[in-house]
Amino acid sequence: MEKGILKVELEHPDHINTCNLSHDHSWITIYVGSGVTLANSELELALGDLIVEDLDFVDSEFEMALGDVDFTGTLHGRCKFDVALGDVRMALNGSRSDYRIEAENAMGSLGIGGAYYDQKMANSWKDTSGTHHLKVENAMGDTDIQFR
């Protein structure tokens, strides 16, 4: 696909999905439906947004040159977000086992925790159990991290 918008919807609650996607030329928006678990997934986007609502992530990585990441869900294991331009918004919910988060953002805003941009992101980061590691690199823009 060389022009236009590619919309990817994953809505299979009873399955664990592996999603490996590389896209270079046109804008891509990925919507991931609720009740889905993505395991060992990797998304590399040159242009586009990643919009995730109510999803379980297991050892996943997202690399984006331009675009926004809007994430609401539960993390298990290692999760890496690497965004060169654009905003990263993460609202984490539910009880989790050990997890590792790396968020690197060269330009734009980085928000992790409760309602940062939008009141609809009312979930809060609740540190319930396990060992947690958070690495944040933000060269330009605002960084907001909330622990409750």
Annotate each predicted stretch with a short phrase.
Residues 71-148:
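Short, surface-exposed interaction patches in beta-rich subdomains
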Residues 1-72, 122-148:
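Right-handed parallel beta-helix
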